[in-house]
Amino acid sequence: MSAQVPAQAPNASAAPAIVRTACPGGGAHDTCGFLRVPLDRRLPDGRKIRIYFELRSRADRSRPPASTVLSVEGGPGFSTTADRSARIQLWRPLSARRDLLLVDLRGTGRSDPLDCTAFRRHILGYIDRAARCAAELGTARDFYDTSQSVQDLAAVLGALRVGRVDLYGDSYGSYAAQAFALRYPHKLRSLVLDGTYQLPGSDPALADLAASTRSGLRLACGRRPGCPAGREDPVKVVAGLVARVRRDPIVGTAPDGDGTPTHVRLDEDALVQVMMSGFYDQAVWRDIFAAARSAKAGDTRPLLRLAAETVTTDGPNGDPRLYSESLYLAVICHDYPELWSPSTPVAQRPAEVRAALAAYPAGTFAPFSAAAWTGTDFEGALACLRWPSPARTDPPAPPGAAYPRVPTLILNGDLDNITPLADATVVAHRFPRSTLVDVENSGHVTALLDQNDCASVIYLHFVSTLSPGDTSCASRTPEVRVVPAFARSAAAVPPARAGRRDRSTILDRRVASTAAQTVADALQRWWVNYDGTGVGLRGGRWSYSGGNLMTFVFHRDSFVPGVAVSGTARWVYTTGRVRANLVVRAGGVLEHLRMRWSLQVRAAMADIDGHADGRPLHAHMLAP
């Protein structure tokens, strides 16, 4: 039976009640539950919706909390509490004196998630499905916006009698956090924006994302010795691929992130989706240059695999309690700027879009066309083309509100091409007491699940002291391990360098180098794998298990034709340490190898020891 605890909430005609529920994995002093709030705050006695929260208690209960960390997830549409493990992990070093509050924004997670039938499957025709979703939601869609969500946050703080908070927002959570800061500056002790963009929104044609994609291509290639773009501009390498698939799409079957054979049609629209995925999947920056070279030479499998891992295809959609596509649309179609005027009838919007795009300078969307960049079928710039304009105006923050002098930390990866560093710079200029940290070689959101013990350490120091402290680690994060080539035989693989006691042949060391790349390829696929098993690029399979210490098991995994890798590799996520024990067969060669390298050291080397047909092998190579 649930208990009701009366508590005060701002701007309410009657004190609302918290309905308590059991806390998932909670401690004795944790509080979880729901707060009922009006759908439309102009009608406090009208329809109510539930806002779900989890208040995780500090360890030291002998005195009041030093503060409460309020963590808000992005999307829009993702559930904050579904991501509790990562947020608790980030908060843990602060947990002696500070509480942690997680809140699912309205329409997400357990806060009565929006669930349009049109989005229960991934199918083409996104704009039409969005229009059907708008009709299904009816006029209620206008009340699922950022302004209402931050007022919900304030209501939860009031109901729980929480004092000033250290607000952490990532991705869209950082957008909502800015809106909260502008509306409730007195409720903030500090503000951290991770992977951020400006209010009311970025360029409606996503031109800034195109610019950051070009920048990302150049940065990823320029920082890695042996990048296959060579002396050619990396953007031109991809531009050549764009021209090819625009003229002649590449069609075939390749494994997705879980190893499921997937039919792929790689045209310009699909390639836009591939490149837009770089913000979360480093395999895009890692593979794209070598995959483009291979496709040009007639080997399309690496490119088709990359597309199968990133391009949205037909199939069941995920649980809306984890991510609500319907809520995503309700928010962006209400809050973000568009390529058409709000007063333009739906039927006239395409003409207005064409005129707006024609005004952009040539090359704005390079290496893609304006039509492909803005018209991609999944969450593109035209997602709201047939969504009705809001019947009410409720901007994310009060018009004319001054940016507060609250201590503000802004974290952004320079390979983030969904909330670009340029946008974070604009936001930093708006907050008078802000520090912007550019985390090199990092994608979208840097402190959560931080592999490099950098952004998370800066965050913890900032919350503790209101100063970011030493931020020099942000310029030392490891480069993207760009694949030098997708070779078709071991003879085409550059050999590992022989050590002092080595008695192996050049072919032995080519095979050893191939084995190291095979392990690295599987480790990279972990980021897009959800069921613990996968397949090799050229055959065989692998699986993994574990948490911070992950064990990968290889069964004749083939990254290069003719080379089969079996054995195990262990990866410690928090330290980046990789250790492998492998049996490798390549033609008549049998190798027993031990290898080790780090994923957290820039320009790291991999050490390889073992035997090749009885010959001692001691070599090293640039860590893959």
Task: Report residues per predicted region.
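Signal peptide processing junction and immediate N-terminal pro/mature segment
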Residues: M1-A9
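Alpha/beta-hydrolase-fold enzymes
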Residues: G222-I332, Y336-P337
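Gly/Pro-rich cap/lid or specificity-loop segments adjacent to the active site
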Residues: P10-A270, Y336, W340-P624
